[in-house]
From Swiss-Prot:
<feature type="binding site">
    <location>
        <position position="180"/>
    </location>
    <ligand>
        <name>carboxy-S-adenosyl-L-methionine</name>
    </ligand>
</feature>
<dbReference type="InterPro" id="IPR027555">
    <property type="entry name" value="Mo5U34_MeTrfas-like"/>
</dbReference>
<comment type="function">
    <text>Catalyzes carboxymethyl transfer from carboxy-S-adenosyl-L-methionine (Cx-SAM) to 5-hydroxyuridine (ho5U) to form 5-carboxymethoxyuridine (cmo5U) at position 34 in tRNAs.</text>
</comment>
<comment type="subunit">
    <text>Homotetramer.</text>
</comment>
<dbReference type="Pfam" id="PF08003">
    <property type="entry name" value="Methyltransf_9"/>
</dbReference>
<protein>
    <recommendedName>
        <fullName>tRNA U34 carboxymethyltransferase</fullName>
        <ecNumber>2.5.1.-</ecNumber>
    </recommendedName>
</protein>
<feature type="binding site">
    <location>
        <position position="111"/>
    </location>
    <ligand>
        <name>carboxy-S-adenosyl-L-methionine</name>
    </ligand>
</feature>
<feature type="binding site">
    <location>
        <position position="293"/>
    </location>
    <ligand>
        <name>carboxy-S-adenosyl-L-methionine</name>
    </ligand>
</feature>
<feature type="binding site">
    <location>
        <begin position="160"/>
        <end position="161"/>
    </location>
    <ligand>
        <name>carboxy-S-adenosyl-L-methionine</name>
    </ligand>
</feature>
<feature type="binding site">
    <location>
        <position position="92"/>
    </location>
    <ligand>
        <name>carboxy-S-adenosyl-L-methionine</name>
    </ligand>
</feature>
<keyword id="KW-0808">Transferase</keyword>
<feature type="binding site">
    <location>
        <position position="87"/>
    </location>
    <ligand>
        <name>carboxy-S-adenosyl-L-methionine</name>
    </ligand>
</feature>
<keyword id="KW-0819">tRNA processing</keyword>
<dbReference type="GO" id="GO:0002098">
    <property type="term" value="P:tRNA wobble uridine modification"/>
</dbReference>
<feature type="binding site">
    <location>
        <begin position="133"/>
        <end position="135"/>
    </location>
    <ligand>
        <name>carboxy-S-adenosyl-L-methionine</name>
    </ligand>
</feature>
<dbReference type="GO" id="GO:0016765">
    <property type="term" value="F:transferase activity, transferring alkyl or aryl (other than methyl) groups"/>
</dbReference>
<dbReference type="InterPro" id="IPR010017">
    <property type="entry name" value="CmoB"/>
</dbReference>
Amino acid sequence: MDINKVLKERQKWFEWKNIKPIYEKIVQWQIENKQLNVKNVKLNDIIEITLDENKEKLKEIEQIAKMLKPWRKGPFKINDLFIDTEWRSFIKWNIIKPHINLENKDVLDVGCNNGYYMFRMLEMNPKSITGFDPSALFNLQFEFINNFIKSDIEYKLLGVEHIPFYDKKFDTIFCLGVLYHRPDPITMLKELKAGLNPGGEVILDTLIIEGDEEIALCPVRYQKMKNVYFIPTLKALYNWIEKAKFKDVKFIGKRYTDLEEQRKTDWIEGESLNNFLNEDLTKTVEGYPPPLRVYLKLKN
């Protein structure tokens, strides 16, 4: 597979009629605002950016942020503008953070969305950070935020299937909330492994169901999503990982997704978690167990 050819083809995505106006606005805004006066950046649970700019500039920033909806991962704050994203992504990050060391490592985040987790990684002083996500909109959200942070993070319009063909290997690969969207989870785990340096690790977050059997749920829809293929028990997931030939697995934790972590805000369109569960939040609208996520560290 020719990755450069793939990337060149995907640049055409910015010409899509729903993306082109936003893309052109972002490009023009970046050209006109190369010298934005960024006073401070705090890479905390809320990524806070403080600017010393006039009201007109700040109003334009707010308009662009609203053009970029829906905002899934975050939150972000730019002066008084609070981008209250659907997910409070720091909840997941704070589960993972005590179990990782990214100092001087080459890091990949697969399914990186708008880059929230990559921005949080910066405080750990990695050697490099690369993000893969085949979404033009999320890429533009990243470019918007990175215009203030000015990191060296590389964002590629690629997916997990491109990892074995990419011209770089990584010490740590983050794969958060992707596995259940793939029709062949064992192949995907092998693709992640193919992207690791010797001794490298994958930080994996995925949906599971409770139970002692080595089985997986295969729903037509799950939380109204058509693109959920398999949700295994933990034992079945460990079997997948063994079949993908990882040497070791460390259990980090598990957590039910709740309305503290994911909810409807003014920064998304449509529905959120409360619309995907029944009234007492004990099952999905389809009658399946509610979303339970497990966090694992896989060693190459």
